């Protein structure tokens, strides 16, 4: 046999080996996913057995004010069809009806809010407030809430940390100043996970928050109290923050809209330990949660303040001419297998745009999305001005992951199990810096090339709807669908798409390139029109 033939045989042998190894890997992955799917089903069966009988329904809503959009309420106050006091009182009454079931609102200012409303009504009645004032204060007289981890002067500001028990804010976060200057009235602050870092809302100071669609289910985190109260009709306007899906996870699980804007347009000052000096590297953002898509842009205009012109929120959008792309499954092996009701949710949206768009939606296959969790972990390690191990002690010392974990599982302590998970995660090695930076840029460039300035991506929200309380401990990576947009700093809107057969919300994410928030919101409005959007978890009369 000649040397040339020998080399050829060796190459063919290597090729066959590579093919065989690839086949084995594919089969092992299929076996893993098949097994994982049925383990997830078993988890639900077991949790359901112990929890389904404990479900408590949300009370019927009898006041039509509760169902109106924040924009509509503001217009009616302006036209004197409603008084601010009537509106605020309606939501105070509703919170008192639903919060005993939800445990969403953890600190209130009802009487002060009603007095704020009466003053507004007096100013409107005597002509002190003019039309120009309404333009500068688009939400005059409309109530809102925000999460307890953001500073609202005079309100609880513990971040769910035991060492901060009883702490109250002495100032307003920058975004709170903006929404107050727009005329909105704060009713209180809502529950969060400890230090905001978990996909369920639970902490040692205020306990766990329940889902209004099924009180035994998760509301998401970290803006879980906001989404729960909003969906139950407890508030018309909600503001959350988002470093890893914290607006969108709760919005998904509670069937409302949530928008994470283009990054670095909204000050972070007053959000937990942040000062506003974190710079452009931070993934932290602030965004609205609403029951009606029409509220997203008006609230966003307020939050971005002087940067409003960068977002083109007043530009008309013809959704038929938007270039649509979609991804059905990000193929991240750490995430639970994608269930059929979630697959059909995104395909319903795709089908709708196939019917109305000038060009059919294109399915994308972008490998980098499967690295979402690893990339987010890397960029979280680069967040400036924060240190989880110190912050969790209120910066009075530094947590010891090993000692505090042992203490938690033996004698208990001041940390939640989710915080212990975060401790253990800190012990794991961070992704390689060179790889993470390169992969982030590669993914960003691929998506920017597809989206341009007139494209959106329809993207999954989760492998399945809201799971039972604490089941997230067995599925700790299921938030990965959300975090990739924090890594890339793209704007993204969580859109409700109705309920599944269990009566739980389903939905999708709508993503655009930076500064194209108006496209996300336009598509959200179209999907709301086509599929109904928010579905109340209570009877109405």
Give residue spans per PLM region.
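Amidase signature
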Residues: 1-134, 302-483, 487, 515, ...
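Short, well-ordered beta-strand elements within core beta-sheets of diverse protein domains
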Residues: 72-79, 145, 163-167, 284-291, ...
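Conserved hydrophobic/aromatic pocket- or pore-lining residues that grip, position, or stack substrates
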Residues: 91, 113, 141, 147, ...
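Flexible, acidic active-site loops/lids enriched in D/E/S/T/G that coordinate Mg2+ and/or position polar
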Residues: 110, 114-139, 165, 169, ...
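Enzymes and membrane/adaptor proteins characterized by extended Gly/Ser/Thr/Asp/Glu-rich
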Residues: 136-175
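Short glycine-rich, flexible loops that bind phosphorylated cofactors or substrates
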Residues: 153-154, 194-195, 333, 466
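Short glycine-enriched, charge-decorated loop/helix-capping segments at active-site entrances
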Residues: 159-165, 471-475, 510
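Short glycine/serine-rich loop segments
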Residues: 171-300, 491-498, 504-507
């Amino acid at each position: 046999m000649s040397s040339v033939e020998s080399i050829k045989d060796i190459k063919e042998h290597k090729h066959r080996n590579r093919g065989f190894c690839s086949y084995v890997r594919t089969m092992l992955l299929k076996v893993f996913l098949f097994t994982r799917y049925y383990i997830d089903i078993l988890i639900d069966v077991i949790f359901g057995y112990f929890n389904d009988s404990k479900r408590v329904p949300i009370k019927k809503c009898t006041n039509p004010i509760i169902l109106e959009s924040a924009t509509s309420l503001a217009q009616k106050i302006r036209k004197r069809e409603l008084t601010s006091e009537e509106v605020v009182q309606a939501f105070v009454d509703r919170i008192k009806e639903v919060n005993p079931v939800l445990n969403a609102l953890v600190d209130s200012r009802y009487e002060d809010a009603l007095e704020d409303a009466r003053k507004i009504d007096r100013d409107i009645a005597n002509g002190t407030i003019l039309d120009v004032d309404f333009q500068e204060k688009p939400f005059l007289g409309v109530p809102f809430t925000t999460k307890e981890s953001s500073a609202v002067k005079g309100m609880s500001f513990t971040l769910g940390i035991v060492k901060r028990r009883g702490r109250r804010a002495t100032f307003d976060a920058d975004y709170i100043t903006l929404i107050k200057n727009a005329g909105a009235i704060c009713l209180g602050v809502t529950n969060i996970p400890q230090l905001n870092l978990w996909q369920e809302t639970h902490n040692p100071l205020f306990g766990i928050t329940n889902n209004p669609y099924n009180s035994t289910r998760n509301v998401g985190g970290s803006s879980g109290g906001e989404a729960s109260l909003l969906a139950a009709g407890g508030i018309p306007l909600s503001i959350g923050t988002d470093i890893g899906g914290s607006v969108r996870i709760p919005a998904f699980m509670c069937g409302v809209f949530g928008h994470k804007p283009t990054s670095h347009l909204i000050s972070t000052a007053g959000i937990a330990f942040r000062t506003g000096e974190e710079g452009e590297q931070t993934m932290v953002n602030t965004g609205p949660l609403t029951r009606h898509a029409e509220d997203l842009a008006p609230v966003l205009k307020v939050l971005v303040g002087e940067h409003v012109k960068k977002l083109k929120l007043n530009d008309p959008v013809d959704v038929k001419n938007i270039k649509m792309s979609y991804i059905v499954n990000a193929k991240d092996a750490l995430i639970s297998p994608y269930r059929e009701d979630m697959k059909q949710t995104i395909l319903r949206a795709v089908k709708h745009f196939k019917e109305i768009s000038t060009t059919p939606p294109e399915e994308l296959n972008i490998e980098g999305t499967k690295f979402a969790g690893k990339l987010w972990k890397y960029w979280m390690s680069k967040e400036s001005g924060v240190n989880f191990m110190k912050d969790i002690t209120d910066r009075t010392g530094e947590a010891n992951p090993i000692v505090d974990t042992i203490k938690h599982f033996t004698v208990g302590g001041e940390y939640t199990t989710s915080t212990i998970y975060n401790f253990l995660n800190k012990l794991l090695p961070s992704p390689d810096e060179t790889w993470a930076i390169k992969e982030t840029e590669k993914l960003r460039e691929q998506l920017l090339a597809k989206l341009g300035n007139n494209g959106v991506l329809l993207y999954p929200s989760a492998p399945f709807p809201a799971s039972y309380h604490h089941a997230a401990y067995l599925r700790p990576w299921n938030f990965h669908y959300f975090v990739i947009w924090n890594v890339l700093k793209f704007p993204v809107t969580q859109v409700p798409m109705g309920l599944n057969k269990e009566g739980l919300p389903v939905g999708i994410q709508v993503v655009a390139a930076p500064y194209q928030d108006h496209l996300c919101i336009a598509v959200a409005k179209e999907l709301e029109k086509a599929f109904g959007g928010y579905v109340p978890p209570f009877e109405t009369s």
